[in-house]
């Protein structure tokens, strides 16, 4: 293990990057959750107990030096790019002014909110920089749950109990702490996870979660709301199905699929010839969550559901690459001028 650490430390120290993209490739190779350093941390459990302290210090030092070196490479690459931009001919004729248009994520977010508003849901908002209690503990996440791992969550360096929220469930927690049932809210917002950026994943994305708490709320109520939402969003012919799943904050839990809106449920490459496409997770609110937030779980019940806005936008407008939503490419964004 020591030889592997020293070898990797030397290898990283020799890395160079001429562009920001090359620096990002190095970060993914060495620092992502499936990278070289993560694999060493996985193997740490095999180290003899008498060597764990020394090896642990070496691993932490390796990770810190790798982050410093790759960040330095990124900053130098950015500085070089800025210098090149500064050499642009300032006497050159400017581009004509263009009128802006609404972003596709904003369009879909508004449509989702309008659908739930027709069902009597109000909109709730909360901070993006959150504490551990509202993001994890109140939502019934165990202390050793993988979502708490630094590979998945952005922690504040000097305040490990302060994080960037990984889901908008934290807003549900805050609403339940301050409001007694009946509660009927949706919680749209931006969330963050420590993911390598690719066509199907990003370090930030947008969610809408819904919460309904009252007396005698049942899974049948949830299913009817899901069917209404799917048909309003994707068309009256849309069918839904629910599959058993697991989430810490709901019990029972399910994932919802809709009939593929491209092939009409007949089967195509987009739906992998199943005729179904997954769009959201849902379930009955776990009694522990209600109790954590000061609501009597013996008196009240509720349901919750959550979806990624990017996922819904992908399906609605058939966008195959998540990166398009954050790259500010006018050729892409102007395609939505006619969408209202």
Curated annotation (Swiss-Prot):
One of its GO terms (molecular function) is tRNA binding. Its cofactor is Mg(2+). Its main location: cytoplasm. It holds the Pfam family Phe_tRNA-synt_N. This is Phenylalanine--tRNA ligase alpha subunit. SUPFAM superfamilies: Class II aaRS and biotin synthetases, tRNA-binding arm. Keywords: Aminoacyl-tRNA synthetase, ATP-binding, Cytoplasm, Ligase, Magnesium, Metal-binding, Nucleotide-binding, Protein biosynthesis. The keyword ATP-binding applies. Tetramer of two alpha and two beta subunits. It is found in: Cytoplasm. It is an enzyme of class 6 (ligase). HAMAP family: Phe_tRNA_synth_alpha1 (MF_00281). The lineage of its organism: Bacteria, Pseudomonadati, Bacteroidota, Bacteroidia, Bacteroidales. Binds 2 magnesium ions per tetramer. PANTHER family: PHENYLALANINE--TRNA LIGASE, MITOCHONDRIAL (PTHR11538:SF41), PHENYLALANYL-TRNA SYNTHETASE (PTHR11538). It catalyses: tRNA(Phe) + L-phenylalanine + ATP = L-phenylalanyl-tRNA(Phe) + AMP + diphosphate + H(+). Gene3D superfamilies: Bira Bifunctional Protein, Domain 2 (3.30.930.10). GO terms for biological process: phenylalanyl-tRNA aminoacylation. It comes from the Bacteria. One of its GO terms (cellular component) is cytoplasm. Its EC number is 6.1.1.20. Mg(2+) binds at residue 251. It comes from Porphyromonas gingivalis (strain ATCC BAA-308 / W83).
